[in-house]
Design a protein with these regions (language model features):
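Bacterial N-terminal signal peptides
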Residues: 2-12
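OB-fold and OB-like single-stranded nucleic-acid-recognition modules
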Residues: 18-154
Length: 154
């Protein structure tokens, strides 16, 4: 009956599991923006951590073509943590879900999505920088020099 009521009123019914919260982009990049990132790096979790934000200055972008999850643009950032340390973080942008997003050396980048410990030359990474695809995630995004992708989520 509730679905019929929504249909009669012209309201779309979307399962709650597909709707994430919209988290605003900070006005400026400060070490405090990277607080949850720092906590994740200190904790070294084995799995993913939902709703992690990073901001920093891009070192550049490389493209990983193909693979199990499709092509990705990988943006490498230098991010300053609240305790004063600077770390390298990768932002993995899925070309199929997010569209290709890249950053040049020196660009300011913010990203919000699912965090992970990446190893190698990076202290951590952020992916799922797109509209929420599961119920425990907020809507993710990546912002390069003020240009946000995605621009909105349904």
């Amino acid at each position: 009956m509730a679905i019929l009521t929504f249909a009669l009123l012209g309201i779309a019914f979307v399962p709650a599991s597909a709707q994430g919260r919209d988290i605003p982009v900070p006005r400026s990049c400060s070490p405090q923006v990277n607080t949850k990132l720092q906590e994740m790096i200190e904790d070294q979790p084995r799995g993913y951590v939902e709703n992690v934000m990073v901001c920093g200055i891009a070192e550049g972008t490389r493209v990983n073509s193909g693979g199990r999850h499709g092509s990705h643009h990988i943006i490498t950032l230098k991010a300053q943590l609240p305790q004063g340390r600077t770390v390298r973080v990768q932002v993995a942008v899925n070309d199929s879900l997010d569209g290709p997003v890249s950053a040049l050396r020196g660009d300011q980048v913010f990203a919000y999505g699912q965090g992970y410990i990446s190893g190698g030359g990076w202290a951590a990474g952020i992916h799922d920088v797109h509209c929420a695809t599961h119920r425990t995630a907020d809507n993710g995004w990546v912002v390069v020099n003020g240009q946000k992708t995605p621009t909105f989520c349904r």
